Swiss-Prot record:
Keyword Cell membrane in annotation: yes
Record's protein name: UDP-N-acetylglucosamine--N-acetylmuramyl-(pentapeptide) pyrophosphoryl-undecaprenol N-acetylglucosamine transferase
Reaction(s) the record says it catalyses: di-trans,octa-cis-undecaprenyl diphospho-N-acetyl-alpha-D-muramoyl-L-alanyl-D-glutamyl-meso-2,6-diaminopimeloyl-D-alanyl-D-alanine + UDP-N-acetyl-alpha-D-glucosamine = di-trans,octa-cis-undecaprenyl diphospho-[N-acetyl-alpha-D-glucosaminyl-(1->4)]-N-acetyl-alpha-D-muramoyl-L-alanyl-D-glutamyl-meso-2,6-diaminopimeloyl-D-alanyl-D-alanine + UDP + H(+)
Gene field: murG
Listed InterPro entries: GlcNAc_MurG, Glyco_trans_28_C, GlycoTrans_28_N
Gene Ontology MF terms: glycosyltransferase activity; UDP-N-acetyl-D-glucosamine:N-acetylmuramoyl-L-alanyl-D-glutamyl-meso-2,6-diaminopimelyl-D-alanyl-D-alanine-diphosphoundecaprenol 4-beta-N-acetylglucosaminlytransferase activity; undecaprenyldiphospho-muramoylpentapeptide beta-N-acetylglucosaminyltransferase activity
Location of the protein in the cell: Cell inner membrane
Gene Ontology biological process: carbohydrate metabolic process; cell division; cell wall organization; lipid glycosylation; peptidoglycan biosynthetic process; regulation of cell shape
TM spans (from-to): none
């Protein structure tokens, strides 16, 4: 049996790849998990629901605001200090064999505590451009798993530890009750901008079927008036729908792109350009370069442009599904290091 402490949350984009790794590890060996969730965020809710067997501890932290000298960061830094003491207490008691971290501020807290206690650290970065937590933790990690070859350019000092694996995707046996539709989604929090654009697209494309994850009950009601649209406030598990989709329209969060690539669904990406260091734009451009996507910049995203691009991606057709889930590569690497 191995004991694993894990953190990576605040958004679905960090959480789902982490769950994919833990679920794959559990298929290979007996695993006991201590999960550090961000209080009040998606990780708390999803982990308690999907993995009641994990020991889940909620930690009250928020990320540092940019620019880093933002006045509110003084208070946030103090909270990070308190959280670190709490995390250390749990780690000392649980005595994990390793820590798996997938980014976000909670990873930073858990990673630095684990480093002080000499616990082996494994990190995964989902995006092309690494976030602050992964940049800091790479120096202490045993291995740094990355989704894209290009990420090496941002972590030059740690080349020997980097393994390009791709971004883990959660598996599901479930199947959506529909088929041959265009899947529309924001990130794990939905996207007002995409909802507004698509509301203008739907009446123009009555022959095309859409499934739209709206992010709110109000939007679900508003978009349900279109006969060609199945509007859902949140889709769970998303894999059930990716399997049956012919194309997608979304933001350019790393997990959404990972799922497009894993399930072989070509798509339109409208990156959220205010994301830290424009990382969504970099993700989107990489997905386009790899042949999975058409990128529409926010300032050019009109209903007309989307309609033209839907036609192109649908005509392109499905791409071959990935043979091996990156989660499986990562599990093998981790077990190879510690067993
Ligand atoms: C707003 C924000 O900070 N976004 C970041 C966040 O991910 P954010 O959660 O916004 O976006 P991602 O695309 O990475 O992940 C979304 C995840 O939510 C799932 N989903 C979505 C809708 C739904 O109804 N059901 C469902 O399960 C998707 O299948 C996917 O697994 O972390 C990512 C990884 O570091 C970054 O690339 C994103 O830029």
């Amino acid at each position: 049996m191995i004991k694993v402490a894990a953190a990576g949350g605040g958004t679905g984009g960090h959480l789902y790849p982490l769950l994919a790794i833990l679920e794959t590890l559990a298929k290979r060996v007996d695993v006991k998990v201590l999960f550090f969730a961000v209080k009040g965020k998606i990780d708390e809710r999803v982990v308690r629901k999907d993995h009641p067997e994990f020991e889940t501890v909620s930690i009250d932290v928020r990320g540092l605001l940019r620019p880093l000298h933002h006045p509110k960061n003084l208070w946030r830094t103090l909270k990070i200090g308190i959280a670190t003491i709490e995390v250390k207490k749990h780690l000392k008691r649980f005595k994990p064999d390793l820590v798996v971290l997938t980014g976000g501020y909670i990873s930073g807290v858990v990673g630095l505590a684990a480093k002080d206690l000499g616990i082996p650290i494994f990190v995964h970065e989902q995006n092309v451009v690494p976030g602050l937590a992964v940049k800091v933790l790479s120096q202490y990690a045993k291995k740094v798993f990355v989704s894209f070859e290009r990420t090496r350019d941002y972590l030059r000092e740690w080349q020997d530890k980097i393994v390009v694996t791709g971004c883990p995707v959660r598996e599901t046996e479930k199947e959506a009750p529909l088929k041959d539709f265009v899947l529309v989604l924001g990130g794990s929090l939905g996207s007002e901008a995409i909802n507004e654009l698509m509301e203008k697209v739907y009446p123009e494309l009555q022959e095309t079927q859409f499934v739209h994850s709206t992010g709110s009950d109000d939007w679900t009601e508003r978009l349900s008036v279109f006969p060609n649209v199945t509007a859902l406030t949140y889709i769970d598990p998303m894999g059930a729908y990716w399997k049956k989709a012919i194309a997608s329209i979304s933001r350019a969060g790393a997990s959404t792109i990972a799922e497009m690539m894993y399930y072989g669904v070509p798509g339109i990406l409208i990156p959220w350009e205010s994301s830290a260091e424009s990382h969504q734009l970099e993700n989107a451009l990489e997905a386009e370069r790899l042949g999975y996507a058409i990128v529409i910049r926010e300032n050019e995203a009109s209903p007309r442009k989307i309609i033209e691009s839907i036609d192109k991606v649908v005509k392109k057709g499905k791409i071959e599904k990935m043979k091996e889930n990156p989660a499986s590569k990562i599990s093998k690497e981790i077990l190879g290091e510690i067993m």
